[in-house]
Amino acid sequence: MKLKSLALLLMTIAMPAMAEQVSVSSKGISLILDVENGKPAQYLYFGSKLNAADLQNLTVATNGRMDAYPAYGLNTPAEAALAMRHSDGNLSTALVATGSDVKQEANATVTTIHLKDPVYNIKVDLKYRAYKDVDMIEAWTEINNGEKGTVTLTTFASAMLPIRRGDVWMSHLSGTWAAEAQLSHEKLQPGEFVIRNNDGVRNSHTDHAEVMFSLNGKGQENTGAVIGAALAYSGNYKLKTVTDDTEYHYFFAGINEQNSEYHLKKGETFKTPALALTYSNEGLSGASRNFDKWGRKYVLAHG
């Protein structure tokens, strides 16, 4: 009996940690992540809301980089959402999951994915707020320095989103004085597409920190699958889409880090601005209506 009990104990210890599907859902859209302790959190899905049966068939894509928040250090040719100089001068960072939790708010659910560096005392929380009555998910990041000295953040995106390659077009607004808000449609091609602002006070003058991705051809007003993204930030911003030799585009959004590295002292936490994400099968106007509802109810004073 003792030998049998010992064998069962050893079997239990040897079993690998099971990955957990973390579902972040509003009334009509879902963002699904694969979270396994000791491994990077990875994207599984973003789009129309899924049911329980759909969730069972999701697997992590193998023809792209699905890390939810890629850090600079282990795959240096790839674009990173986070890069830092540690207190000892090292530039390498790795982030693996340590768990997740969910908190209820009055009209939303906030999901937190906890990440940490296995070597350095750096903790990163990926935050997702899904509204119950509006098809909008806010994504932001909180970076905590537990090292003995100050670390320097050199890249600190709010979020990254992989988008499957195909006939994908990006719509955005640009302009100048007396000709603001000129709508442009750009087909995503290999390379990088960057929208950035360095002005500091007129950061909606020449461009806007918001884009829409039409997934099946040039953006149409009332038809087609569309991902919308808007950075809720009034300072210098950067939106960047990277298309490389994988089967995905990679969209990064956050504070423009150009000449703006941040010195994070021991014990301090840095919080990025939120990136608002939506999805619609009713074209550009469908995504726009989602932003309008969210903005009036939750962003604008007396909206």
Task: Identify the role of each PLM range.
Residues 269, 274-275:
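Residue-level marker of beta-strand positions
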Residues 278-289:
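Short, Lys/Arg- and Gly-enriched loop/turn segments at beta-strand edges
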Residues 20-33, 39-242, 258:
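Polysaccharide-binding surfaces and accessory modules of carbohydrate-active proteins
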Residues 19-21, 245, 249-265:
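Short acidic, Pro/Gly- and aromatic-enriched capping/linker segments at domain boundaries
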Residues 1-7:
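Bacterial N-terminal signal peptides that target proteins for export
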Residues 14-16:
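N-terminal signal peptide c-region/cleavage motif recognized by signal peptidases
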Residues 271, 287-303:
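An acidic-aromatic substrate-binding cleft motif
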